[in-house]
Swiss-Prot record:
This is Transmembrane protein 202. It comes from the Eukaryota. Keywords: Membrane, Transmembrane, Transmembrane helix. The keyword Membrane applies. Its main location: membrane. The keyword Thylakoid does not apply. It holds the Pfam family PMP22_Claudin. Disulfide bonds: none annotated. PANTHER family: EPITHELIAL MEMBRANE PROTEIN-RELATED, TRANSMEMBRANE PROTEIN 202. It is found in: Membrane. One of its GO terms (cellular component) is membrane. The chain crosses the membrane at residues 60-80, 116-136, 151-171, 193-213. It is a multi-pass membrane protein.
Amino acid sequence: MERKEQTMTFYSPEVIKIKGDLRYQRPTLPTNQQSVSTQKRQQYVNEACTYIRMFCGSLSGFSVLLLACTSPLNLVQFLVNNNGLELKAGLWTLCYHELCWSHTPKPPYYLQYSRALFLISILFMLISLGLLLSSCRPAERMMSAELDLKVSMLSFCSAVSLLLCLNLFLAQVELYTKNAMEYEFLWTYYLSWCSEVLYICVGIISFLNFITFQFHPPDEGVSADLWQKSRLGIGPVPKTLSATAERSRSEMQFLSGRQEKLQNVRKGKLATTRL
């Protein structure tokens, strides 16, 4: 027996076509007409600012750790022209050769200024990192937009200090390699420049976070006195109670009391009519 082929047809309903109007061809999707409440929107903004601060804190910590690991290493390699001797030195390390520098300060003091600016850069970044870490604690004062501005300024100051430090170290190297030696920077020197880029990124992100937080000020009707830990256990999440909820609760209590009074009055009238 021959099998009949099963065919499937798609149902296309008739659509009323209006001449010159092509809107019927545009599909319309259902939209949610319920707008987000002010309390919920403010909570989303606070959580976003907190996560951005945590990201900036991780970048700051990584950059400080990178500088701390590369600072005791050699940054430049020298090649003596006469005998082909290779020497290595860094910001805090010496090559112990007569052609290299020593710890004794000598004018124009490029090395000493470079070391001082390096310490200043680390200090600024540690202060910024401390502010970012303290903002993750449940404290209402740390949710202000001034914190992001402070972190941005400290990050830019740290970036400028590190930039001057690296440029002065370059001037120190060129001063000692004018005639007798040639130099070549090592990979640790370029990692220091990576820390410079991270400092600038932290400053830019914190400044953008400050601008965003200014356009979304905290709502006065929302009380952020009670705090609870987030799912990650790091960032603060406010446990708020809006004034509208309290008002609706008081209205419900008033209406329920009024209904009880009306029921009591009706019961009293029924009792009198029976008598």
